[in-house]
Structures are given as C-alpha cells and as structure tokens.
C-alpha cells in the first residue's frame, strides 16, 4: 500500500481537523489523494489530524485507518491501561514504538526526506498561544510535537518540549485557515470531521481550573 512514483507537488495547502476516531474520514480522503498522486506542498495537522497527516507525508495508504480500526479495543493503545501506564488515554509510547516499528512499520525515511511542509499545530500552555512547527525546522523530536498536538486536555498529560508544556492544538486553533491565508496560501483544502453547523463551546470552568 505504498504510493509509488509519478507524484507532482501541488500548489495546495491541506488543513486537517482533529476529532479522535472521526479522523477515519480524513484518512479516507488522504488515501484518495495518494491514490491519484496528489501531493500537497503544505499539510497542517491539528490533533488527530496531525497523526493522520504523518501517513500522508510518509506515503502510506490505509496505515492510519488500520491502526485505529484494528486497535480501537486494544487497551494499550487507548483506554485505562494506557492511562495507567503512560498518564494519558492514548498510549503514545506504544504507538510510536511497538506499533510503528513492528505491526504497522512507519516509513521514517520517506517521511524525513519528503519535501512537503508538514506542520503540526500545538498549544503552548504557559503562553496560551498557538504554535506551528514545521518538521524540517523542528529542533525537537517531531513525533513529540505530533503527540502534543493530539494530547487532549483532561485526557492526556502535557507534553514538555524545550522549556514549555504543550497540549492539543485544537484548544487554541482547531482550524487554522486564517493562519494559512496570512501566510499567503491561495489554494486551501480543509478536511472537517464535525457537522457544518458545529460551534466550539466556551471553555468550561473545570478546564479553567485545571489549566
């Protein structure tokens, strides 16, 4: 299921919304783009969109969907066992180590060498701002940035990167269209996982007290 040859970089920016397992829809769209060798030059991933976007950059069709479908009842991947062992409802160590090296090998080489700009979106908890980290400019482990982007408040522990702590990019910027426009991007394709009439609610008092 590896995408082979014939790719032409498109003047296209993809914005991938999060949404936990709703990202299966995003996976399907990205698989179709890969099938027809449509290679966007910019890919912004928020939360689960960042996890899904990694497989678009590594050119691995169906990998994202298989991991989520085949492991949705795997307690090491998601659930109380992951929470107890890793401090979060998603077992990121298990995902990036065991699963990505054995059951579902991740093509690190293709990912690393890709000329596409892959930008996970994260929330800086100290400063309360959104940060955009491009993989080739990242001074830290890009997989840690992806983990931070998809670490949901209350369900995950904060991820330390440098001197700051980070959480899900969707906390401050769920759909970074304005950022893309300000950066001069002209052709933007946004993959949404929520209903069209959805509106983000105000931050709860519980969330304010915790963070």
Kindly give the residue locations of the regions a language model identified:
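Patatin-like phospholipase
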Residues: 2-46, 54-211
